[in-house]
Design a protein with these regions (language model features):
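Catalytic-core elements of nucleic-acid end-processing and repair enzymes
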Residues: 434
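N-terminal localization/anchoring segments of enzymes in phospholipid and broader phosphate metabolism
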Residues: 1-352, 356, 360, 400, ...
Length: 513
């Protein structure tokens, strides 16, 4: 008995999903290397080399004509030029935005069938100033996410502030609970949520969970779905990792959404894992942000969740059962416009919203982002805003979770600083919030990082707040956070020749990161 527990832990560890995945990927790489070096000799190796180089050339030609973000294309073309033998294969594994036909057709069919559920109701944007009207119209017309009044919002400046409110709202659920997260990990935070979900499911509440299979790979046991389904909690592990078929899969579900009875919704950067509420310490203090909305605007997230769900487990033909008839609507507090972004179309919703806010800013614009890997268009928008006198500030982590990505983020500092952008690093720990606020009139709280993967490859979500009181709450949070940060100066960006070369290489590899 003394040795039983360590032995069980050892076998559980070596049989965990992440261990199996790493081993299978390593075996795949070893097999490919063996095929190339052992089986391809002489003429055969010349043919294989020619095929790989030809593949890289075809992908470069494909990228040149593709309607895609120019910086993203140039990054991949440069990488393929640097590694012509492997560049094409790397693009297919890591960079290809084109989803499987099956995934695209499923999502498009569901979204088209429920397009009328996203219709803009008249009079909802009345009273918006000129600077706000354009971005709201864009989200309505090109994102199909209507704007709403009669919605209250509450901003949370950290996970431990949001968590009790989330639990309290889950306890009040009477009809449905929908959850969609990138990371679900066993621990205190998930246990508190799971206990309520189990009770509510036993009471007949419709409980559903979508989680990203890759994001949750480390945190969940192999039998998680079976356990949840036995408790009448329906689950979809999105885009399951199949290591023998691909080295990595794009199109991760990076969204964070909770919808309760169609009346209350949550979003932000906070996943269901202990570090997000600082129940455990990882990379110092974990600074995040969340948003609770209640009222008419919740409908956008309800439809977003149901569209995603029905693409994989078709269930509802009519969403109206999930649209509550609110006897008393909340007083209007500006406009609230929840939205989502998808890699399945060619519309870069997340990036366009940020670009519009920057273009319309006159006094200030602040960003929270854990990562910075941006294209020329976003880089120019930040610099141009600063050059015309706007107070542009970026807040990033002081303690990184990924050191190479942090180094990549810092490689963008100098051109921004020289244009007048002010950059801060959050010294108490890791800043994971993804927010933007401008001119006391517009803000975004959501799951969207300022990097290639969020802007172009992942499923993301956010809430646009226009002339809403929580715009000021986010502004005040940023201003309270700045004294806890170290402001970066141009002198801090001197890296020497070796550092400059490393930064250049990381820029080339940025589409992979």
């Amino acid at each position: 008995m003394l040795f039983r527990l360590p032995i069980v832990k050892f076998f559980n560890r070596i049989l965990s999903r992440i261990t199996v995945t790493v081993v299978l990927v390593a075996l795949q790489l070893a097999w490919l290397a063996w095929v190339f070096f052992a089986l391809t000799t002489g003429t055969a190796r010349v043919w294989v080399t020619g095929v790989l180089n030809g593949l890289s050339l075809l992908i470069v030609l494909y990228l040149v004509r593709k309607d895609e973000n120019s910086a993203y294309k140039v990054g991949w073309i440069a990488l393929i030029g640097l590694l012509p033998l492997l560049g094409g294969a790397l693009y297919l594994a890591f960079g290809n935005k084109r989803p499987s036909r099956r995934l695209r057709s499923k999502m498009q069919a569901v979204e088209q069938a429920h397009r009328t559920d996203r219709a803009q109701q008249p009079g909802q944007t009345a009273g918006l100033c000129d600077e706000n009207r354009g971005v709201s119209r864009y989200l309505t017309q090109y994102g199909c996410y209507p704007a709403w009044q009669n919605t209250t919002a509450r901003y949370f400046s950290c996970g431990e502030a949001m968590y009790p409110a989330l639990l309290a709202d889950l306890e009040k659920a009477e009809k449905s609970i929908f959850l969609e997260f990138f990371i679900v990990s066993q621990g205190k935070m998930w246990q508190g949520v799971e206990d309520i979900l189990r009770r509510k499911a036993a009471q007949g509440v419709d409980v559903r969970l979508i989680y990203d299979d890759f994001g949750s790979l480390l945190g969940l046991p192999k039998d998680f779905v079976v356990r949840m389904e036995r408790a009448h909690i329906r689950c979809i592990p999105f885009n399951p990792v199949v290591p023998l078929l691909s080295l990595v899969m794009n199109h991760r579900d990076h969204r964070k959404i909770v919808v309760i009875d169609g009346k209350v919704a949550y979003t932000g950067g906070i996943n269901l894992a202990d570090e997000y509420i600082n129940a455990i310490t990882r990379f110092g203090y974990w600074k995040d942000a969340g948003l609770r909305i209640e009222g008419a605007a919740v409908w956008n997230f309800t439809v977003t969740f149901l569209d995603f769900w029905n693409a994989f487990r078709p269930f509802e033909q009519d969403y109206s059962a999930f649209r509550p008839q609110l006897a008393v609507l909340p007083d209007s507090d500006g406009v609230v416009q929840p939205y989502a972004d998808s890699p399945l179309d060619e519309e870069p919703v997340a990036e366009t919203v940020y670009l519009d806010i920057l273009a319309q800013s006159q006094q200030y614009v602040y960003f929270y982002t854990p990562y910075l890997a941006i294209g020329e268009e976003m880089l120019d928008a930040l610099r141009n805003a600063a050059k015309r006198g706007v107070d542009v500030r970026l807040v990033l982590p002081g303690i990184p979770d990924k050191k190479l990505v942090f180094r990549l983020s810092r490689s963008y500092y100098l051109p921004l600083l020289r244009a007048g952008v002010r950059i801060y690093e959050y010294t108490p720990g890791f800043l994971h919030a993804k927010c933007c606020v401008s001119d006391d009139r517009a803000a975004v709280v959501g799951s969207i990082n300022m990097d290639y993967r969020s802007m172009f490859l992942h499923f993301e979500c956010g809430v646009l707040l226009l002339q809403n009181s929580q715009v000021l709450a986010l502004r005040d949070d940023v201003r309270r956070t700045l004294p806890q940060c170290r402001e970066v100066q141009c002198a801090d960006c001197r890296t020497g020749l070796a550092g400059t070369v490393l930064d250049s290489v990381l820029r080339l590899l940025s589409p992979l990161m």
